[in-house]
């Protein structure tokens, strides 16, 4: 079976090796690492072309980066060619979440709507703080930062690609 780019979810980039045993140093976002460290089957891509499909042997953290060790590769020279590759997983392999929980990739790109203000724009990014995630929405109101808390999220509709908010007064600067 040939994998299409749309079948894959890119979770990071190999930025180097670590040690002599073939560990790969991965750069990605805070939202990517927990999922990437759980996935067993990985796909390495360079310029959209598959370089290697393999199983994850081990994953761990080191100085803000994820270290991956892949099955069958125990030497730094054997994995050197993967530096610069994107690390992806098949979307179908991503485990489901309990009702009401979503992966970042399901939310990014959604149309953000507030019950009172109407369309806010597009949910373009998500970042993590000590307290909770923050949704970055860009649109007619400029950049709006919305705390990802249940009190503000009225509904998430994956089928219509829309997230409905019930934002408090003052969170969005109205002109």
From Swiss-Prot:
Q: Does the keyword rRNA processing apply?
A: yes
The similarity comment for this entry is:
Belongs to the RimM family.
- What is the protein name given in its UniProt record? Ribosome maturation factor RimM
Swiss-Prot/TrEMBL GO biological process terms: ribosomal small subunit biogenesis; rRNA processing
Q: Which GO terms describe its molecular function?
A: ribosome binding
HAMAP family, per this entry? Ribosome_mat_RimM
Can you quote a single GO CC term?
Answer: cytoplasm
Know anything about its domains from the record?
Answer: The PRC barrel domain binds ribosomal protein uS19.
Function, as annotated: An accessory protein needed during the final step in the assembly of 30S ribosomal subunit, possibly for assembly of the head region. Essential for efficient processing of 16S rRNA. May be needed both before and after RbfA during the maturation of 16S rRNA. It has affinity for free ribosomal 30S subunits but not for 70S ribosomes.
User: How does this chain assemble?
Assistant: Binds ribosomal protein uS19.
- Alphabetically list the UniProt keywords: Chaperone, Cytoplasm, Ribosome biogenesis, rRNA processing
Q: Which Pfam families does the entry link to?
A: PRC_RimM, RimM
Fetch the InterPro entries from UniProt: PRC_barrel-like_sf, PRC_RimM, RimM, RimM_N, RimM_N_sf, Transl_B-barrel_sf
Q: Does the keyword Cell wall biogenesis/degradation apply?
A: no
Domain PRC barrel: start-end pairs: 99-171
**Coiled-coil regions, chain positions:** none
Taken from the UniProt record, the cysteine pairs bridged by disulfide bonds within this chain are none
Please name the source species. Answer: Syntrophotalea carbinolica (strain DSM 2380 / NBRC 103641 / GraBd1)
Lineage top rank: taxon: Bacteria
Q: State its location(s).
A: Cytoplasm
């Amino acid at each position: 079976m040939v994998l299409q780019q749309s079948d894959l979810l890119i979770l990071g980039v190999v930025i180097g090796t670590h040690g002599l045993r073939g560990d790969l140093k991965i750069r990605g976002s805070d939202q990517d690492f927990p999922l990437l460290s759980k996935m067993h089957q990985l796909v390495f891509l360079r310029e959209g072309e598959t370089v290697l499909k393999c199983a994850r042997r081990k994953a761990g953290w080191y100085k803000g980066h994820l270290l991956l060790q892949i099955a069958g590769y125990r030497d730094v020279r054997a994995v050197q060619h993967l530096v610069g590759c994107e690390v992806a997983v098949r979307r179908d392999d991503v485990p489901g979440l309990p009702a009401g929980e979503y992966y970042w990739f399901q939310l990014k790109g959604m149309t953000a709507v507030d019950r009172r203000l109407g369309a806010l724009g597009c949910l373009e990014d998500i970042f993590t703080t000590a307290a909770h995630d923050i949704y970055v929405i860009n649109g007619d109101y400029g950049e709006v930062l919305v705390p990802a808390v249940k009190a503000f999220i009225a509904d998430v509709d994956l089928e219509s690609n829309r997230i409905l908010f019930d934002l408090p007064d003052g969170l969005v600067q109205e002109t």
